[in-house]
Amino acid sequence: MIAETPAPAADALRSFAPSKAEGLPRRDAIALTLIMLTHGVGQTLIFAILPAVARDLGIADQAVSLIYVLPAIAWSFMTTWWGRHSDRRGRRIVILTGIVGFMLSQLMFAGAALLGYAGWIGAGTLWALILLSRLVYSGLSSGSLPASQAYIVSRVSPAERATALGRLTASWNLGNLLGPAVIGLLTALGVLTPLFATAALALVIWAWVRGCLRSEGPGAGATPAGRLSPLDARLRSSMLIALCGSFAQASLLQTLGFYLMDHLGVATAEVPRAVGFALMFSAISTLLAQTVFVQSLRPMPRTLEILGAGINAVAFLGLILADRLFVIWIATALCGFGYGLLRLGNVAGASHAVRGDEQGAVAGLNSAMWSAGYIIAPLAAMSLHQIDPRLPYIAAMLGTALALTAAKGRKEALEQA
């Protein structure tokens, strides 16, 4: 499937290079891009490899769901802590710690699975070790994104902020796109080979980034302004938009396969292929939104939020009314495009609303809110699906409509940094 997407990927890669007008050195931009790319690939590997390992070694499906949910909860708490920590200690040390966390978690997962395949540990112990590996990732690596965002914000003008942050988030999405290709190439050597390979890649990137990011960044050694609250008057609308957007996206990802079977009657054997194409189209659309669209038009954050929420609401309406698989694919592509605009506008808008000494804290808080939907959706969306397969998407549509209302109801934040 990845071989069919060279043009969007090429367009995205060309747009990663910062313009001369930006204050972010090209060396730093490349380093941050590689970090996010690696995280994106690693995320795809876990979603692809964990089900196979669990089925092979007897871990129950319900137990697997906890491996997703518990680290997501840990991520939402730790990302805010790391964001504040980067305001005090600097961005560089937090970014480097995130790479170490990624490497350790991949090795711990692979090592536990090897012990399981060798018959040295049972399913219960294996589950605990895999869960621990994911908690290590959440605990140490959840600071990578907010610290990287704050690193960029401190070096670019407000006018260039959305485009610079767009390249950062798009590189994670590009990693999600490239992940299946990595899996296809390396699993021929063993199901765990991609985990060892990405851990080795992380070590190389850590050594290179350690030499590239020479500055800790503004805030190193300083006293942070204090804990930010999602109820802060400057941030209430942004945090509400993030929560609604996160819930909508998580509901789509976690119920789509069931929706295809229960609403369209797609055969079980065809579901992985159908969902795979849907997610591929969504990822490509997100990548195009955050690179080609944003880099070309350079809209303001509030405009991005309004466009993204509006497109998402229309896309979920399409999912609700869909009676053909190709309509589902079109709707999920629209969801990806809207999600890309909405999240980017939300991240940039929140950064505009606070002072320079609060950039790490707001980036961490924003990341936590975008993670919260993945905690709520497994229970809420699946419960709604049991009543009617369309209900999760009706709830998601209402959520994006609420996000649209919140975006339209507030003024563009003025730069306070």
Language model: regions and residue ranges:
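Helix-loop boundary and gating motifs at the non-cytosolic
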Residues: 22-72, 237-241, 245-265, 271
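C-terminal transmembrane helical hairpin of 12-TM major facilitator-type secondary transporters
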Residues: 301-346
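Juxtamembrane intracellular "pre-TM" segments in multi-pass secondary transporters
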Residues: 8-26, 213-241
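Cytoplasmic helix-loop-helix junction between adjacent transmembrane helices
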Residues: 133-172
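Hydrophobic core of transmembrane alpha-helices in multi-pass small-molecule transporters
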Residues: 37, 119-143, 243, 327-341
